[in-house]
Regions:
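C-terminal flanking tails of non-heme Fe-dependent oxygenases
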Residues: 1-198
Length: 198
């Protein structure tokens, strides 16, 4: 996190102060061998909800959206880590970092992925940093609580939770952002900040 702060021209502690007991997750994702896979979609387009993701893939298949709204392959290199910017860094940076819109294409070979979803502390208020607001003349994003954002995005992503939401068994936190409202995907959908915030 300190490195991201330095890249923004800030002191490392401006972001590091929010990393004390983060609810980060390291996951193992398995994509089984699929003889019939031929450039079909595996995991749909999304951004990661946290600050950033470190990813160690074992085969090709990851695609990212570039600034023109085109899907491009991420070149696979054995043992190389991929860093995806997440929603929270986009907001903190006031858009200087853009959350990585990405998806996974089904490939014939068996594939494993080891993502570390790196979050900030659950109760952190994430909003554009004052220095970056001054640089751009205005805040491009409204504030959100990190834990509320993780919860809201999870509810809106998984079908069984969307069904519970529709039945009124659970509810979204106030100010929940729509899934896909950040990153290049959100920009290319034409969502304004006001539209993206409910």
């Amino acid at each position: 996190m300190g490195g991201f702060a330095i890249a923004l021209g800030l002191a490392p502690q401006q972001l590091l102060q929010h990393i004390n007991k983060p609810p980060s997750q390291l996951r193992l994702i398995h994509y089984p061998y699929n003889l019939n896979a031929e450039d079909t979609q595996g995991i749909g387009a999304h951004t990661d909800y946290e600050c950033f993701t470190l990813l160690l893939p074992t085969a090709p298949g990851l695609e990212v959206m570039n600034g023109k709204g085109e899907w491009i392959d991420v070149p696979f290199k054995e043992g190389a880590l991929i860093v995806n910017i997440g929603d929270m860094l986009e907001i903190w940076s006031n858009g200087e970092f853009v959350a990585t819109s990405h998806r996974v294409r089904k490939v014939k070979e068996e594939r494993y992925s080891f993502p570390l979803f790196f979050a900030c502390d659950y109760h952190t208020v994430v909003e554009p940093l004052p220095e970056l607001v001054a640089r751009h003349g205005q805040a491009r994003y409204s504030a959100l609580k990190a834990g509320d954002h993780l919860y809201a995005q999870t509810i809106q992503t998984f079908r069984y939770l969307r069904e519970r939401l529709a039945r009124g068994e659970i509810k979204l936190p106030d100010g929940a952002r729509e899934v896909g409202s950040l990153g290049q995907h959100g920009k290319n959908k034409g969502l304004s900040n006001e539209e993206a915030n409910r």
